Structure formats: C-alpha cells, structure tokens
C-alpha cells in the first residue's frame, strides 16, 4: 500500500521532525542545506530526512536545487508565505471575535453604561 502524498502544508508541519527541518532551513538564511547536513543536525537518519524533505516539498514548503552531485534544500518562499497569510487571517478573525466578546462582557456593557 502506497502512502497518499501530503499536499496540505499544515499536515506536513504536524510532524516535529519536519518542523525541525523547516526551522533549520529558516535559520540558514536562505543558503540551504544538503540532506547530510540536515541529518547531522537531527536525531534521525539520512533516509528519514529524505522522506521528510519529500513530504515538505510535496506540500510546497521546501524546494530543492541540484548543485553538482548534491541536492540543496531551501524553504520555498511562496509556500511559507501562504501559511503565514492564512495564520494572519485566522488570527485577525479570532482577535476580532475576542474583542467583540470582551466588549460585550465588560462591566460597562453589563451595567448598560
């Protein structure tokens, strides 16, 4: 049985190892890292890092660039920006609802002032 490809970035980010990979790539300042460099920095094997990178790539969060015989992985700006924009929108909606509830339950609102 073949696993279904991960296309949802939030599903991809649901794994702590994949989040660690994203954090390492973000900390690199855009220079990118090879599978071996990532494996050296994580408590998982090189094949496991490769599998996680494949899922992150399918979700649009990571891109790969062949350089010589190596593949260098970097964050995919468009994918990361899409996640950020979604979170900003959801946070804004939640904050607006909270402000509405808070204003309706303040002592002044309850007392009719």
Regions found by a protein language model. Give the residues of each.
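Amphipathic alpha-helical dimerization/coiled-coil segments
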Residues: 1-5, 23-27, 81-113
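Alpha-helical residues within the helix-turn-helix
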Residues: 40, 51, 57-58
